[in-house]
Amino acid sequence: MAEKQTAKRNRREEILQSLALMLESSDGSQRITTAKLAASVGVSEAALYRHFPSKTRMFDSLIEFIEDSLITRINLILKDEKNTSTRLRLIMLLILGFGERNPGLTRILTGHALMFEQDRLQGRINQLFERIEAQLRQVLREKRMREGEGYTTDENLLASQLLAFCEGMLSRFVRSEFKYRPTDDFDARWPLIAAQLQ
């Protein structure tokens, strides 16, 4: 029984990995059908549906992976780092680096892969970005408590500016067919970003 469960879990992971790879390829800029996905995995469409009731559920699983990866690591940064500037820099690098290492999933983050799918999926991505923005805002607000001095600019505005930078770099990555990596020149860009944090 345990072997059967492991085999089923492995097949599910194989399906999700194939979907992510298809999103990374030129197929990712078009609607991905279950027929194409089944052919990529080497199974029938019926076999796909034994593991996932719908393609939407496959995207849900990929979004869960994105959420877990980003939120868990952001929480680790917040636990380990106390300096506000370092926290912000590491969170931004995390988002950009995750996108760079997972180009297919970046198409999901930017919404490109979800254009032909259910609106609910885009809503989940919107919620993820709202959670990240809320965490950035909290880091900015905690500066006053941690370092004795806050920002003169509204933390809401600063948090949205930081997240907009990340979203823009991810969008540029997808638009360029993954040519312009999100972390390229980040060390040179950071002082420009940090200068806005007043």
From Swiss-Prot:
The keyword Chloroplast does not apply. The keyword Coiled coil applies. It is found in: Cytoplasm, Nucleoid. Pfam families: SlmA-like_C (PF22276), TetR_N (PF00440). GO terms for molecular function: DNA-binding transcription factor activity; transcription cis-regulatory region binding. Keywords: Cell cycle, Cell division, Coiled coil, Cytoplasm, DNA-binding. Residues 117-144 form a coiled coil. Residues 33-52 bind DNA. Residues 10-70 form the HTH tetR-type domain. One of its GO terms (cellular component) is bacterial nucleoid. GO terms for biological process: cell division; negative regulation of division septum assembly. Required for nucleoid occlusion (NO) phenomenon, which prevents Z-ring formation and cell division over the nucleoid. Acts as a DNA-associated cell division inhibitor that binds simultaneously chromosomal DNA and FtsZ, and disrupts the assembly of FtsZ polymers. SlmA-DNA-binding sequences (SBS) are dispersed on non-Ter regions of the chromosome, preventing FtsZ polymerization at these regions. Belongs to the nucleoid occlusion factor SlmA family. This is Nucleoid occlusion factor SlmA. The gene is slmA.
